[in-house]
Swiss-Prot record:
Protein name per UniProt: Methionyl-tRNA formyltransferase
GO cellular component: cytosol
PROSITE patterns: GART
Catalysed reaction, written as an equation: L-methionyl-tRNA(fMet) + (6R)-10-formyltetrahydrofolate = N-formyl-L-methionyl-tRNA(fMet) + (6S)-5,6,7,8-tetrahydrofolate + H(+)
Function field: Attaches a formyl group to the free amino group of methionyl-tRNA(fMet). The formyl group appears to play a dual role in the initiator identity of N-formylmethionyl-tRNA by promoting its recognition by IF2 and preventing the misappropriation of this tRNA by the elongation apparatus.
Alphabetical UniProt keywords: Protein biosynthesis, Transferase
Cross-referenced Pfam families: Formyl_trans_C (PF02911), Formyl_trans_N (PF00551)
Organism: Streptococcus pneumoniae serotype 4 (strain ATCC BAA-334 / TIGR4)
Family: Belongs to the Fmt family.
The UniProt record lists the keyword Transferase: yes
GO molecular function: methionyl-tRNA formyltransferase activity
EC number: 2.1.2.9
Domain of life: Bacteria
Amino acid sequence: MTKLIFMGTPDFSATVLKGLLTDDRYEILAVVTQPDRAVGRKKVIQETPVKQAAKEAGLSIYQPEKLSGSPEMEDLMKLGADGIVTAAFGQFLPSKLLDSMDFAVNVHASLLPRHRGGAPIHYALIQGDEEAGVTIMEMVKEMDAGDMISRRSIPITDEDNVGTLFEKLALVGRDLLLDTLPAYIAGDIKPEPQDTSQVTFSPNIKPEEEKLDWNKTNRQLFNQIRGMNPWPVAHTFLKGDRFKIYEALPVEGQGNPGEILSIGKKELIVATAEGALSLKQVQPAGKPKMDIASFLNGVGRTLTVGERFGD
């Protein structure tokens, strides 16, 4: 039985962990995840999905603010683990820890070498990729730069957003890891170096990148909106107030970028640099998320054709 330390944080990681727990070829000696954080307006302390899954399984849990140089890292190195599996952990692993293991692999939610970094699923959508995927890779000191053990792709559809793609790729990652790990441990797979000429990066989304620029095409804005749904959520401004857009569809239309072209009972069409967007799910300032019909029947009922979104 191979003894593992698992490291991860969000739902994506929890799905991978649960997969490992169903396989009797592995024993999880410890789980490492990010510390509990205060979330939401009420600052409620929330455990990570990986911590919740580990508690349910009765596993030992470590939550260092920073793994490097921590007492927790020293404890982990004394457990006698054969290897480490990480999936969206959110911290760099010190070389000292990596070197103490027979192997260390990462489940990364992109088709490397494309989209190295912390937001690969967001960028796959924002940049209009036709496919997404998961790469199982060896861990090295440089971020997401290790040799590739295996890859598996799925198509991206127009119905996908960050939430749906996270769910799909979590299952892909779980299955790919379970399919790949035994042969890798046995030495039957020769990892493939990444083509450095094809590397792209997907750093965490910055707040200024959430703002919509109506001078882009309808397709570019469509991709940006779904590439930030359900988090961090794209926004614009309406009458000086922040206005979040969760869902929109590209449609035909022509006008000044940001201009309202038409208003119906269940339809609000806004011009872009090329074509237009039909807004479907929005959140006005100080209000909950709502469908466009609810918005137009409520706070949006005073809108008129010709008014503009934007600064």
